[in-house]
């Protein structure tokens, strides 16, 4: 209140009686406030300048937006043009008439790869364009190659495979036909099959009569080995009785050797009868030669095994 009253009294005083203003150093706070307020002005000015400077940017942004709008408009035009382009790029299906197809097929049978001039001629004949004719020939060649490939596959499946399938048998069928199995190897190794049960096609095809006819009786052997002009008594230095004894001995021994009951190996129809016949014939010929030698000068000497038959020799 005192300060307010003092202020009021100073204002009521005339100008001449008013006290002088305070010294400048007392105005520091006011100047300081003014100084503090001064830096704000540039800030405000800078803000205004920045806002003013932003205006061209905004204008530029607006100007930039115009191309964006224009770009959007162009994009819209492009989007509007895309379906048109798609419609242009989309191929329309060509429907050929029967006359056109006949002409094209006839030309394809003559030439599968027509050149440009020939395609143009075909296009003129069929009232088609050259690209249509070219595409038709391309598709027709692809269809023809596919048909040829399928025919070759059918021939391979239907013709050649059955011919070879009859010749080649699976492994299981071969083993089954031969009588083998995968589980009886141990049984076969422990219990071998007898000789008479084995099958040999070559020897089984030979009958016992043919095997016996191969090796004839001693009389026939003696007649074959001796000339026809030489009879039993024509041998010099050898009596007829000695030759008769030789024939009797060799005939009895050979008959006993070739008889089925004399040998315990099996019937003459067995595949090993040929081998036994060869052994018997060789032994019989050896005994015949020994008898002949003994009759010529060694009649008193006779081996201990001269009375044995062929089977006893084999044993």
From Swiss-Prot:
Keyword presence, DNA-binding: yes
Phosphoserine: residues carrying this PTM: 46, 48
CDD domains hit by this protein: homeodomain (cd00086)
Residue range(s) of DNA binding per entry: 89-148
Compartment(s) of residence: Nucleus
Compositional bias segments (type: Basic and acidic residues): 55-68
Biased composition (Pro residues): 17-26
Chief subcellular location: nucleus
Motif Nuclear localization signal, chain ranges: 287-291
Function: Sequence-specific transcription factor that binds gene promoters and activates their transcription. May play a role in the development of anterior structures, and in particular, the brain and facies and in specifying the identity or structure of hindlimb.
Protein name: Pituitary homeobox 1
Annotated organism of origin: Rattus norvegicus
């Amino acid at each position: 209140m005192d300060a307010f009253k003092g202020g009021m009294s100073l204002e009521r005083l005339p100008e001449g009686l008013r006290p002088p203003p305070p010294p400048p150093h007392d105005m520091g706070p006011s100047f300081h406030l003014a100084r503090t307020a001064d830096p704000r002005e540039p800030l405000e000015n800078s803000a205004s300048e920045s806002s003013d400077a932003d205006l061209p940017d905004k204008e530029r942004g607006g100007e930039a937006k115009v191309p964006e709008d224009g770009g959007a408009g162009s994009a819209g035009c492009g989007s509007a043009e895309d379906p048109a382009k798609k419609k242009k790029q989309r191929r329309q299906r060509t429907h050929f008439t029967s006359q056109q197809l006949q002409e094209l097929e006839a030309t394809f049978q003559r030439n599968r790869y027509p050149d440009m001039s020939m395609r143009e001629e075909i296009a003129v004949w069929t009232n088609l364009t050259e690209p249509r004719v070219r595409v038709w020939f391309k598709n027709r060649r692809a269809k023809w190659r596919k048909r040829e490939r399928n025919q070759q596959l059918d021939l391979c499946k239907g013709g050649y495979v059955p011919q070879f399938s009859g010749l080649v048998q699976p492994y299981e069928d071969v083993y089954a036909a031969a009588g083998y199995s995968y589980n009886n190897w141990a049984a076969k190794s422990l219990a071998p099959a007898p000789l008479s049960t084995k099958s040999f096609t070559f020897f089984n095809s030979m009958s016992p009569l043919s095997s016996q006819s191969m090796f004839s009786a001693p009389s026939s052997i003696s007649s074959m080995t001796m000339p026809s002009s030489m009879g039993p008594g024509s041998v010099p230095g050898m009596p007829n009785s000695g030759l008769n004894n030789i024939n009797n001995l060799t005939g009895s021994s050979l008959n006993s050797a070739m008889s089925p009951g004399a040998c315990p190996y099996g019937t003459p129809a067995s595949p090993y009868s040929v081998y036994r016949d060869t052994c018997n014939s060789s032994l019989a010929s050896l005994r015949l030669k020994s008898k002949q030698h003994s009759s010529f000068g060694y009649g008193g000497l006779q081996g201990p095994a001269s009375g044995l038959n062929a089977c006893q020799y084999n044993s």
